[in-house]
């Protein structure tokens, strides 16, 4: 999973 500084790995969503 690749996201920014705020990334919910549990929900697999990008903020």
Curated annotation (Swiss-Prot):
<dbReference type="GO" id="GO:0005576">
    <property type="term" value="C:extracellular region"/>
</dbReference>
<dbReference type="GO" id="GO:0090729">
    <property type="term" value="F:toxin activity"/>
</dbReference>
<keyword id="KW-0964">Secreted</keyword>
<keyword id="KW-1015">Disulfide bond</keyword>
<dbReference type="GO" id="GO:0008236">
    <property type="term" value="F:serine-type peptidase activity"/>
</dbReference>
<protein>
    <recommendedName>
        <fullName>Snake venom serine protease</fullName>
        <ecNumber>3.4.21.-</ecNumber>
    </recommendedName>
</protein>
<keyword id="KW-1199">Hemostasis impairing toxin</keyword>
<comment type="similarity">
    <text>Belongs to the peptidase S1 family. Snake venom subfamily.</text>
</comment>
<keyword id="KW-0378">Hydrolase</keyword>
<keyword id="KW-0325">Glycoprotein</keyword>
<keyword id="KW-0645">Protease</keyword>
<keyword id="KW-0800">Toxin</keyword>
<keyword id="KW-0720">Serine protease</keyword>
<dbReference type="GO" id="GO:0006508">
    <property type="term" value="P:proteolysis"/>
</dbReference>
<comment type="function">
    <text>Snake venom serine protease that may act in the hemostasis system of the prey.</text>
</comment>
């Amino acid at each position: 999973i690749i996201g920014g500084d705020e990334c919910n790995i549990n929900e697999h969503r990008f903020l």
